[in-house]
Design a protein with these regions (language model features):
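Active-site neighborhood of HAD-like aspartate-dependent phosphohydrolases
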Residues: 2-71, 89-92
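Substrate-recognition "cap/lid" segment bordering the active-site pocket of phosphatases
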Residues: 175-186, 190, 203, 209-268, ...
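Acidic, Mg2+-coordinating phosphoryl-transfer loop and its flanking beta/alpha structural elements
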Residues: 269-313
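Receiver (REC) domain switch/active-site residues of two-component response regulators
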Residues: 28, 227, 312-313
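Non-catalytic, alpha-helical, charged scaffold/linker segments
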Residues: 58-160
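Conserved Rossmann-like nucleotide-cofactor binding loop
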Residues: 30, 37, 210, 275, ...
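Short, acidic loop-to-helix structural element flanking the phosphoryl-transfer center
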Residues: 11-14, 19, 24, 140, ...
Length: 313
């Protein structure tokens, strides 16, 4: 974990020595391990998107033992470009990249052989990149629709039963259990309880839709520890009014959670991506906030830590 605050010990040490009044958390891979849910959903959404339909982009690989098109390391590396905190946006950006690759055969196996995410990311110096940046660089593809991405992604993540319940329609692309069932709690609830006992308020600023955020927090019995929550739902509502993107690294979700907690407090924001750190940096214009990088679940923690350090100031 990267933090500018020095570690201390003892009861109420955080409150007394660090003098933070409130902690704001991201959810994914900070409070809840989502490597096998959200990140895997990105991979499977891309595979379905490219290989499903009467005239698919690519023919699917044969055999039950076929390798996935992308790895978790690929997804993590791509997200370091910035502007891809939202998983639908990340999926969109990856599809733009994949469909720009030169292939001789229209098969997923051939496409896999051309993928070099790390090399592509290394070349990009102007960050955050985001969906607009990658389409400016590689060109927009008329076959990539965010609505279709969202539909496939939600079917895979929620699973047949919950998707039908929440969307009031039956799944088309995925009729199995949802990958959200694979999620695990990162910390024991007692840690949050100790923070509350120390007089620290707790908030959340997440890119999850509100239903998915509340569902997960309630499932792991930690919802009641949080005094304020800002989700993608509130971000989209504000975007509709302001006619601009307010997703991380924009500080909107942090500022909104801080407003609910009391904006004059001193905040610590804990996230796992450069977008999180950059959002906190941007929020410093309006509130007293520091950030802590939390690359615990990165496939390459040292590399992730170095990228987070570049963003911190």
């Amino acid at each position: 974990m990267i933090t500018k605050a020095k570690p201390v010990q003892g009861k109420n040490a955080i409150a007394k020595t660090h003098k933070f009044d409130a902690f704001i958390f991201d959810i994914d891979n900070v409070l809840i391990d989502t490597r096998k849910s959200y990140l895997e959903s990105i991979i499977k959404t891309i595979e379905v998107y490219l290989s499903y339909g009467q005239i698919p982009f690519f023919s699917a690989s044969k055999g039950a033992s076929r390798k996935p098109l992308l790895t978790l390391e690929d997804i993590e590396e791509f997200k370091l470009l910035g502007g891809f905190n939202d998983d639908w946006d990340c999926t969109y950006g990856l599809l733009v990249y994949l469909l720009s690759l030169p292939v001789k055969k229209r098969t997923l196996d051939e496409l896999r052989s051309k993928i070099a995410i790390a090399a592509f990311v290394k070349k990009i110096k102007n960050r955050p990149l985001g969906t607009s940046g990658i389409t400016d660089m590689l060109g927009a593809h008329t076959g990539i629709k965010i609505e279709r991405i969202g539909r496939i992604f939600q079917e895979i993540y929620l699973g047949k039963s919950l998707f039908t319940q929440t969307e009031k329609t039956r799944p088309v692309f995925w009729k199995k259990r949802g990958l959200m069932d694979r999620e695990k709690l990162v910390f024991r609830p007692q840690l949050l309880e100790k923070l509350k006992e120390a007089g620290i308020q707790l908030g959340i600023a997440t890119g999850r839709p509100r239903f998915e955020a509340i569902f997960a927090l309630r499932k792991f019995e930690i919802l009641d520890y949080f005094d304020a929550i800002t989700t993608m739902g509130e971000v989209k509502e504000a975007e509709a009014i302001q006619k601009t993107s307010l997703r991380k690294p924009h500080p909107f979700s942090l500022l909104e959670t801080a407003r609910q907690l009391g904006a004059k407090k001193k905040f610590l924001y804990i996230g796992d991506l450069p977008d999180d750190v950059n959002a906190a940096n941007a929020a410093k214009k309006d509130i007293n906030i520091q950030s802590a990088g939390f690359p615990l679940f990165a496939a390459n923690p040292f590399h992730a830590q170095q990228e987070l350090k570049k963003s911190q100031r």
